[in-house]
Amino acid sequence: MLIGFIGLGKLGMPCAEAVVDKGYHVNGYDILPRQSTKVDIKSSIQEVVEQSDIIFVATPTPHEEGYDGRDPTSHLPPKDFNYDSVKEVLTECNKYVRQEQVLALVSTVLPGTIRRELAPLVTNTKLIYNCLLYTSDAADDTPCVDLGGRRI
């Protein structure tokens, strides 16, 4: 099985390299120049999609100061994340993806956004969300319960 990662920042690169450490070949792409001794860095989204079975999308979703999840925000006016990069990547992936492949979105997305804004951009294959990826020591120390959900 060939794995792809689009977005090799603070979440994408550590996760991609961890997948390599488990014995898988990983293709990766980022809009910024990246280097890795483990991940096979590609020059385009198209290359990653065409050479991978599962493609993880780990692009940033910037947010306003104070909405990073560290402090409660229920007393503040609701603010959404900026999904422009996610939308661009999903739209580009959809041009090249095949029905038997899977797109897995791991970027931070608020509830309802997948169904309302992002899933409609992926028409040629399955889009899954909320797959758990951890960086650093969190993977070793975090208990995990995985529950099923509704298909989108």
What is each residue range found by the language model?
Residues 1-40, 47:
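NAD(P)+-binding Rossmann beta1-loop-alpha1 motif at the extreme N-terminus of oxidoreductases
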Residues 43-48, 64:
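A structured beta-alpha segment of the ubiquitous adenosine-cofactor-binding alpha/beta core
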Residues 52:
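An anion/phosphate-binding loop that grips the pyrophosphate of nucleotide cofactors and donors
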Residues 56:
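N-terminal Rossmann-like NAD(P) cofactor-binding module of classical short-chain dehydrogenase/reductase
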Residues 59-60:
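Conserved NAD(P)H cofactor-binding loop of Rossmann-fold oxidoreductase domains
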Residues 63-133:
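Rossmann-like NAD(P)(H) cofactor-binding subdomain of soluble oxidoreductases
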Residues 134-139:
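Conserved small/polar residues in nucleotide/adenosyl-binding loops
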Residues 145-152:
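Hydrophobic alpha-helical segments, chiefly the membrane-spanning helices
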